[in-house]
Amino acid sequence: EIFGRYKIGSILNTMGENCPDREWMRNVMAQIQEYSIKGCGIPCIYGLDMIHGASYLAEGTLFPQEINLGATFNPIHAHNMGKTLAYETRSMDVPWVFSPVMDLGRNPVWPRQWESWGEDAYLQTVMSETEMRAIQGEDRNSIGTYNTAACIKHYLGYGVPVTGKDRTPAIIPDYE
């Protein structure tokens, strides 16, 4: 009823706890799609926040945070994380992930520094592009069977809060 009344077309879920296994999540996804098609006539796109592996799957693979992988300066690690993250997320019938974090960690006291690849724009570009291609696959016209759609997070300015505190204003000069 809620899908029809409010015309819900997408859900971003940041679960408080891990789902116990793939089958449990596949059943949840089947119910969501059933209600969505019944209420709206279209499937619901469902996404999970997965910035360092399949973190909402109890049996999922977790990788080091982006700041740690960025310290290696090796894009193969971003590729492996993206490929594994996509495969394990898709195994739960979840078609969409919120990853990678593309904000530059420019303020050292920002409490979410660990979610970024660091402060270097070139490193950020290389690692993020590599992870995105691994998540979505190489075909730009289609998401593969073992891939998911990816949505970048915190794209611009979130990592430079004036106070250093999370979710506070950023002042970004033109020269930056």
Regions found by a protein language model. Give the residues of each.
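Glycoside hydrolase catalytic-domain context in secreted enzymes
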Residues: 1-176
